[in-house]
């Protein structure tokens, strides 16, 4: 199982799947060996290691502008903690993994569709881009990351225009920093309430190592490698079909 987690997390991050942590959570929660809360904890480890490694590859904390970094970190951490607390309350009222799967197939479908759309080229009104709007967007994306396990990066990249206030707010490292902060708060809360399962250290290390290596390899191929970009698009289409199939099975059982 440890090597299966290593290879699956590596290739999910390497090929450019838009929501690798969410896919890992779906697979783990579908397995009878893991409880829903255990799947949340393991997918949080994968997200934290993978996005953290990608953030380091893009320059770390210093790659993000200081004003944006100071505003983003606390609200993203709080949003991730709030989102995970809502999810834990949901899982506490249900037994088994089927309710969690039903909750995840819809955002998985929406995120796959969002990744297929072209980047947002328009711009919002100038007055909508103050510090308060930036904090609100980071808090909302943090809640999405903590509740669904993924999606904050895609939402932030799609909703926040990159042309406005570029010096203060825009940076390719900001979406990754948002996910790392949100996942840190979510994983800390999950660990505090108990993961309902004791994981072997080897399993957790293999999962984190696979996610980190996959993210680093993807960053090296980001500027070149048309084959892997095409493979990523093909895999997104395949995951879209899988999400549709999962939705059909989850809601028609």
Region locations from a protein language model:
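A generic alpha-helix surface/boundary motif
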Residues: 22-26, 154-155
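Juxtamembrane transmembrane-helix boundary motif
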Residues: 1-18, 25-37, 56-146, 162, ...
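Short hydrophobic/aromatic, small-residue-rich stretches within specific transmembrane helices
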Residues: 43-47, 175-179, 203-204, 208
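Transmembrane alpha-helices of multi-pass small-molecule transport proteins
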Residues: 42-57
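Structural signal for alpha-helical transmembrane segments and their flanking helix-loop junctions
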Residues: 132-190
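Gly/Ser-rich catalytic serine loop of serine hydrolases
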Residues: 17-20, 152
């Amino acid at each position: 199982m440890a090597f299966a987690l290593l290879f699956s997390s590596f290739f999910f991050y390497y090929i450019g799947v838009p929501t690798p942590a969410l896919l890992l959570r779906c697979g783990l929660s579908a397995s009878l060996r893991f409880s829903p809360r255990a799947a949340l904890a393991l997918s949080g480890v994968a997200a934290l290691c993978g996005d953290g490694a990608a953030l380091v590859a893009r320059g770390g904390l210093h790659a993000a502008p200081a004003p944006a970094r100071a505003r983003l970190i606390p609200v993203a951490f709080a949003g991730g903690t709030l989102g995970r607390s809502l999810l834990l309350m949901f899982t506490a009222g249900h037994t088994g993994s089927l309710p969690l799967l039903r909750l995840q197939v819809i955002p998985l479908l929406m995120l796959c569709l969002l990744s297929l759309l072209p980047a947002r080229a328009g711009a919002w009104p100038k007055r909508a881009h103050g510090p308060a709007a930036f904090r609100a967007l980071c808090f909302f994306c943090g809640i999405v990351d903590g509740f669904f396990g993924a999606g904050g990066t895609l939402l932030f990249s799609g909703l926040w225009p990159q042309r406005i206030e570029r010096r203060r707010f825009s940076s390719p490292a900001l979406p990754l920093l948002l996910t790392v902060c949100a996942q840190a708060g979510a994983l800390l809360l999950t660990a505090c309430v108990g993961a309902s399962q004791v994981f072997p250290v080897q399993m957790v290390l293999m999962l984190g190592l696979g996610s980190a290596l996959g993210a680093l390899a993807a960053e090296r191929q980001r500027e070149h490698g048309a084959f892997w970009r095409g493979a990523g698009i093909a895999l997104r289409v395949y995951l879209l079909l899988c999400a549709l199939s999962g939705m059909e099975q989850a809601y028609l059982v």
